[in-house]
Amino acid sequence: MKDMISDIKSKKPLVHHITNYVTVNDCANVTLAIGGAPVMADAIEEVEDMVGIASALVINIGTLNSVKVKSMIMAGQKANELGIPVIFDPVGCGATAYRREVARLLMGKIHMRVIRGNLSEIMALAEENIHMKGVDAGSENISQVNDLLKNYAKQWKTILAVTGAVDKITDGQRLTEIENGCKEMGTVTGTGCMCTSLVGTFVAAAQQDAYDATVEAIMTMGIAGEISWKQNGNKGLGHFHMGIIDEIGKMNINILKEWGRIHEI
């Protein structure tokens, strides 16, 4: 395991977010907490200039409108042109036809270096993009799910980070499982979005090692949640929520090594 957190703190990479207004403050704060520099600009008049000075672009479709979609496409294509990694969070993409249409549009126009979502979101992407029908998102056949995820990563030429009770990261060849985190993280709005922002920050600082950067980012979020719940769970969800950001700010390679539960498949 590499000490990517120290690299982030020394480089202070600028991470450009076009994200949703429900969780934008938390996304900015976790980026700052781990050592990055967030900017949350979505005006179509400036996104190309902003992404041009960034080290990564995070696109999150949690709250959509037609103007923001145009900004996402413009920023994403500029990032691709400049070799800046794009991290995509297809929030709720299976919930409505509009979300599915936008996710499909973005995937067709922008190369995503990393896609971070839960299993149902990834399955919704797969149905639209590679026409694999009838996949049970709740399947207990772990081997089948792992094979599907590897196939999706190959098809999309991306690193796929699927978060849940057991997090799975694959580039189509390797597959890493992480068993950190706690179920209580689902009681706080935005932990998935925060996780995606961490992925963007880690990848921004380690662009040539995006796979390991993604793994360490997912571990960081899970471990921060575990520690915060242990320390703050009896104080209420507000303390738990803020505690996650506190623990991200205190995270280091030694904590990752001590708390990390990770294995290769």
Which positions does each model-derived feature cover?
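Conserved phosphate/ATP/ADP-binding segment of small-molecule kinases
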Residues: 100-175
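Short, well-structured alpha-helical segments that form the helix of a local strand-helix-strand
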Residues: 148-153, 210-225, 244
